[in-house]
């Protein structure tokens, strides 16, 4: 176990600071058992000033989510102020510019850890963008584009994942880039 992310995106979905009390309890419970691994709850990805402050004060490692390319470097600069290790736990969104080619050199330069949320296109369907599934389901309801029982077609631009279910890469150029960056 690398670390415990005790509460993903507190304050999201309109709960804002209403989630603050539950987050306080969550931090109390986590510190009561105090595992040997670091504790964290994301800062960028959480919503509400009190929530952000609480997570910043209590996280051993500062974790964050940044999907928009133009926000990545400013977010890293802002979070460096905590003086703790940084780990980006959600970032890969090709349609928003946070591709491997864009993001990984920044993480490397800034000494920020990261991991890719999706790997193989499968049951979770994270190769589809946030709006793709809803759009396709609407077309399906109208009898357009897709029939009951048909597989959803592969999107032109994937969101998270790297490999197809058969093991072939979505973009061979990404695999080559990652190998070159890692020196393998």
Where are these regions (language model features)?
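Carbohydrate-associated surface elements
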Residues: 7
């Amino acid at each position: 176990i690398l670390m415990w992310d005790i509460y993903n995106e507190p304050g999201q979905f309109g709960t804002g600071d209403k989630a603050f009390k539950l987050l306080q309890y969550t931090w109390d419970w986590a510190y009561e058992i105090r595992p040997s691994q670091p504790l964290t709850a994301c800062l960028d990805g959480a919503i509400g000033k009190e929530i952000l402050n609480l997570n910043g004060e209590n996280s051993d490692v500062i974790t964050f989510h940044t999907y928009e390319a133009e926000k990545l470097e400013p977010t890293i600069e802002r979070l460096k102020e905590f003086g703790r290790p940084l780990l980006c736990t959600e970032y890969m969104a090709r349609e928003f510019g946070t591709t491997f080619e864009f993001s990984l050199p920044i993480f490397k330069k800034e000494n920020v850890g990261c991991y890719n949320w999706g790997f193989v296109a499968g049951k979770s369907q994270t190769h589809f963008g946030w709006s793709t599934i809803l759009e396709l389901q609407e077309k399906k309801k109208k009898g357009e584009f897709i029939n009951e029982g048909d597989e959803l077609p592969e999107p032109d631009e994937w969101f998270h994942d790297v490999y197809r279910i058969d093991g072939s890469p979505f973009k061979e150029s990404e695999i080559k880039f990652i190998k070159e960056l890692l020196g393998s």
